[in-house]
Design a protein with these regions (language model features):
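A generic beta-sheet turn/junction motif
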Residues: 15, 24-26, 53, 82, ...
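Glycine/charge-rich catalytic "coupling/switch" loops of P-loop NTPases
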Residues: 2-5, 10, 37-74, 103-132
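Short, conserved beta-turn/loop elements at beta-strand boundaries and strand-helix junctions
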Residues: 11-17, 78-84
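Residue-level structural signal for beta-strand termini and adjacent loop
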Residues: 14, 35, 81, 101-102
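A short macromolecule-binding patch
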Residues: 28-34, 52, 95-101, 119
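Short, acidic/hydrophobic/Gly-rich beta-strand patch recurrent on exposed beta strands
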Residues: 19-25, 32-33, 86-92, 99
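Tandem CBS (Cystathionine beta-synthase) repeat/Bateman regulatory domains
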Residues: 7-10, 20, 27
Length: 132
């Protein structure tokens, strides 16, 4: 699991769902939370939270697209297996672990030092209260 600490800067809620914007060292990370602000104490502006996402929930791109949760980085390390590959991407000093199929790595022409864009779906970012 990857964990990035940040502070909630905005909450947009409707029908028991919230779109939460968290300011982090990477930039703004957006997450969808299945609770109303009154139900989850940490879903409030200025609250410190952890943004958590699995290594398998990260998509790497070689070209920039117009999307939220898109962060530029450089591949710091790459362990290529027959089927799966594990990568570490440095995004503004934050090390993000990524798992891709080795076929994806080959198709994208990825290697150590390659500049990439990391894309996270807001639906796959989990927010957790950060100890004050």
């Amino acid at each position: 699991m990857n964990t990035i600490k940040g502070t909630v800067v905005s909450v947009n809620s409707a029908n028991g769902l919230c779109e939460v914007e968290v300011k982090t060292p990477l930039g703004s990370i957006y997450a969808v939370v299945l609770e109303s602000p009154g139900e989850a104490e940490f879903v409030k502006e200025n609250k410190r939270v952890k943004c958590i996402f699995k290594e398998t929930e990260v998509l790497l791109l070689r070209e920039k697209v117009s999307q939220i949760n898109l962060f530029e980085g450089t591949i710091k390390s790459l362990e290529k297996g027959r089927v799966l590959s594990t990568l570490v991407v440095d995004c503004k000093g934050q090390e993000i672990r990524v798992m891709l199929t080795s076929r994806q790595v080959d198709n994208l022409g990825l290697s150590q030092g390659t500049e990439v864009y990391m894309l996270l779906s807001p639906m796959h970012v989990i927010l957790e209260a950060q100890d004050e």
